[in-house]
């Protein structure tokens, strides 16, 4: 069986747009008839996903797999680092947690994971025509180069040609690209087959003199100037933008608490796309105000974030709103916080054994355990105004929760899940709004409470919308890149089955 061709996208910095460029290439190659899979050897992210077989992987490669039209597979992201503090992360290898590690301890051992990386990559390469590889940060981090397993170090391992992207929207893109190239070794520079100017706004003709000078100084071609594309596609790099405080300019005001260790904020992207729902992320009582719904999202460190909630005054503010009838929703870690007690007998969350009082809004108690619960889930909401909504999601949590109240939903096997008390709702399900049914029922529920007519505000199905956005992304990138040069870098022609 022949091995797949590959192309790698590296960037001059974090946030250069590597993830979306890779998603675009996945879509383009799939449109051109190739079997495509994304790959990133090591991803650091708080947003993760559970595959069909219960393995945990980064959401960036999930999005890229969706763009390629294939099911997410943990082989696409064999190493996932989930930060739990400023100096440590949970290390997940092949979808399974290996435990917490400090940054220094991880750097000492990460090269031992090369066999896992190569096994995952080679397995994917045997099943596909093209592998689209995403780098991380910058290949010019000279203090990290010796043990690199995600940028040029990986490119050497799999013999990948590289496209280097710079973000012009932040300014200084010529210095970014030239400086990065100059800091690379000669054999690394030889791997770069083209430079990409990403996120450009304006008249490209103004750039022409700079592009010519950049090509002259680097001896590398600029293979595209990609415009700033306004597409609604989940992007790890958009975290800071999405978590920025924005006033609600839509009829309904939804306030999501910006927890210090917030995770899987992507759960709420479908809400942002609804014409009646204004979504804000807040981190103070002043910002909270009097919303129509308060949401406590997932978190990588429930105990620390509960302490922060208490110290910031947001706990008292949420309790006051709830007492006045404002609906409150908790997801995963946020659900645990809404309960009566949270016990960490082994120090899994806190580092040391402890028990904390929760907000007391739901009759539940949670005990954290070393084992992580990972599963894809189908359910039907059974609570009040949400009853009958079909849910498709996944669970990622360490802890067992005892529920002494009414369930939020019923799983496909008949098991009750989550909890409801009055206008307070909690669930472990991530992705609960993706099908659209719960979003519509939530919107009607909130509209009625506020005296707003919800008629005519329904959305197209989330999956249909997602596919439209992937096509828009691919169209924009295809028009901007010299795709003949990209295919030539891989030794392929644009039409499937042709080789150069």
Where are these predicted regions, by residue range?
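Short active-site segment of divalent metal-dependent hydrolases/proteases
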Residues: 335-336, 433
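Flexible phosphate-sensing "switch/lid" loops adjacent to ATP/NTP-binding sites
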Residues: 1-320, 327, 344-347, 370-371, ...
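Gly/Ala-rich beta-loop-alpha elbow adjacent to hydrolase catalytic centers
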Residues: 330, 334
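Extracellular/periplasmic helix-exit of transmembrane alpha-helices
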Residues: 339-347, 351
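Conserved P-loop NTPase catalytic core
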Residues: 348-375
